[in-house]
């Protein structure tokens, strides 16, 4: 590595690069799609490029918003959850700093930097999106800085989720209790 591309600078480039891309994609999805609207990325790309073929079906932009923790769970108060996220990002940042100072492998630093950037992006969603956007619904696309104000106060916004990879698309076995024969997508 050259003098300019130190591990610390690489970490910062990854964090800011991922964070900027994350927020640009989230704002584009939020201001151009209805809630739970889904678009096959390859179909869209094939249409734009004029490719006459059946596109793969394993990568979608599926607009949803997450009220709570992973999988949309809402076990604890939203304010506590947002505060916890901020504390967790500070801890990840501190560990990243220590890893850089210890001279850990660049690949490891990049991975931790991407995790940190994703967590920061979710904090931005929680802190600002409730104030900056109105409600996204099945019949209304959100607008930036609506006249009547946003859908939630500071720290109470929802995390925008949009990447969907239905890699496994099958049916449960007939012998499986409660879900026998039902479709299973993961």
Positions of PLM-derived features:
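Alpha-helical transmembrane bundles and membrane-interface segments of multipass inner-membrane proteins
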Residues: 1-186
């Amino acid at each position: 590595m050259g003098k300019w591309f130190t591990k610390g600078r690489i970490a910062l480039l990854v964090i800011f690069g991922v964070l900027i891309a994350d927020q640009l994609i989230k704002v584009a999805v939020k201001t151009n799609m209805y809630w739970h609207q889904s678009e096959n990325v390859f179909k869209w790309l094939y249409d734009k490029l004029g490719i006459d073929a059946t596109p793969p079906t394993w990568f979608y932009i599926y607009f949803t918003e997450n009220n709570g923790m992973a999988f949309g769970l809402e076990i604890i108060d939203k304010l506590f959850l947002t505060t916890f996220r901020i504390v967790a990002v500070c801890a990840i940042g501190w560990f990243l700093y220590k890893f850089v100072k210890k001279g850990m492998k660049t690949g490891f630093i990049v991975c931790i930097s991407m995790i940190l950037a994703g967590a920061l992006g979710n904090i931005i969603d929680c802190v600002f999106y409730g104030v900056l956007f109105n409600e996204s619904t099945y019949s209304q696309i959100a607008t930036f800085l609506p006249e009547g104000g946003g859908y939630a106060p500071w720290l109470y916004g929802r995390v925008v989720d949009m990447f969907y990879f239905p890699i496994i698309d099958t049916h449960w076995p007939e012998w499986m209790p409660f879900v026998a024969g039902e479709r299973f997508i993961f």
